[in-house]
Amino acid sequence: MITQKGKEHLVKDKQKSNIYLRILSGIVLVPLFVIAILWCKPLFYILMILVGTGMLSEWYNMTYSSIPDLLIGLIIIPIPISLLIFLSMEDTNRWLIMLYFCIMWSVDTFAMIGGKTFKGAKLAPKLSPKKTWSGLVTGVLSAGLVAVLVSFIPNFHIENYYFSNKIYLFIISCILALIAQLSDLFISYFKRKFNIKDSGHIIPGHGGVLDRFDSIILTTLILFLMKIYL
C-alpha cells in the first residue's frame, strides 16, 4: 500500500522526469528549427508541414465526435502554418521568424518556471489548472527580454523600425507572448471539452505536437498583420 507521502514522492519524481524530457526535446528541436529558419529554407518548409500534419491529426483524434469542432481545426491550423511558410519565402523575414519562435519558446518556458517558483492565484483553473498569474507575468516579461537579447546577435536585422527599436520590440514581443498564452488557453478549452490532458505523446516531456505548437494558432496572424501594417 502506497502512503500519501509515497504518492507525493511519485508525483515529484514524475514532474522531474518530465522536466528532463522537456530539456532533452528542446536540445534536439530548438537547434533544428534555428538551422531551418536561418540557413535551410526547404527544411523549414518540411518541418512546418510535419507540424501542421501532426496538429491536424491530433485535432482529429480529439474532436472526431463533433463535426463543428472538427471543422474549426481545419481552419485554425492550416492558416498559421501557411502564413509562416509564406513569410519564410522572403529571405529578409528570416530573423523575424527566428524572433517569433524565440518569443513563443520563451513565454512557454518562463511561464512554467515562474508558475512553479512564485505559485499564487490560478489564471484559469477550469481550463488549465497549472497556469498561474505569476507564470503569465513571468513568461510575458521574460519573452520580451529574450526578444531584446536576440536583437543583439550579430547580423540580426529586421527591415522594420518597430522591430528594430529596442523599446518597441520589447512591447511588441510582450503582446505576442500574451496572445500566445491566450492561444494556449483557447486550445485548453477544447482539451477540457473532450476530457483529455495532452493531445498526444509524440514529443517527450511536451505531449503532442498540438501541445507544443498551440501558441501559433492566434499569434501568427497577429505577426503577419504587424509585418504588413507596422
Curated annotation (Swiss-Prot):
UniProt pathway: Phospholipid metabolism; CDP-diacylglycerol biosynthesis; CDP-diacylglycerol from sn-glycerol 3-phosphate: step 3/3
The family database entries (Pfam families) matched by this protein are listed as:
CTP_transf_1
Keyword Lipid metabolism on entry: yes
The record lists the membrane-crossing segments as 33-53, 67-87, 95-115, 133-153, 167-187, 206-226
An example molecular function term from Gene Ontology annotations: phosphatidate cytidylyltransferase activity
Q: What class of enzyme is it?
A: transferase
Record's signal peptide? none
Localization recorded for this chain is: Cell membrane
- E.C. numbers: 2.7.7.41
Membrane topology, from the record? Multi-pass membrane protein
- Catalyzed reactions per annotation: a 1,2-diacyl-sn-glycero-3-phosphate + CTP + H(+) = a CDP-1,2-diacyl-sn-glycerol + diphosphate
Tell me which family the UniProt entry assigns to this protein.
Belongs to the CDS family.
The name under which this protein is listed is Phosphatidate cytidylyltransferase
Q: Which organism is it from?
A: Rickettsia conorii (strain ATCC VR-613 / Malish 7)
At the highest ranks, the source species' classification is: Bacteria, Pseudomonadati, Pseudomonadota, Alphaproteobacteria, Rickettsiales
UniProt gene name: cdsA
